[in-house]
Amino acid sequence: MRHLIAVLTLVVLNGLLSMPALAGDNSQYDPALAERAGADEYGMKQYVLAFLKKGPNRDRSKEEAEKLQRDHLDNIGRMAKAGKLVLAGPFLNDGELRGIYIFNVRTVEEAKALTETDPAVQAGSLVMELLPWYGSAALVEVNELHKKMAKKAI
């Protein structure tokens, strides 16, 4: 059920982000920005969505868990810097679903290769469910905007 709620939330947010593009011609259209983002004529593009779930191997000491989390966050930063990850974050509960990634890649295979670089996946602490997803191309701008809003680095 939580999985369904998360997906429905993303669908609603994506719809709200893309509504101006669906209303007809857009006087604010910036062709250079659209091309840079890889947008189609509706300002949308294909991504791969990853649901991070609890893996089978989560029994660690506090120190090991903290190091694994640090390595996991470093990997997120590396993928974001490379332009392959446009959004990442945890769910704010202690359920089976731990977080979400939105990969800026066209295929599930590309996303799978990226998830395999995650130390938490390698250690069996997390497993990923990957789904092709169509959303606003504006998401590729999130990481640059985030840098301007974050007082402290993660």
Where are the regions that the model predicts?
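Positively charged n-region of N-terminal signal peptides that target proteins for export
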Residues: 1-4
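Bacterial N-terminal signal peptides
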Residues: 6-18
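Conserved, structured core segments of small domains
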Residues: 22-154
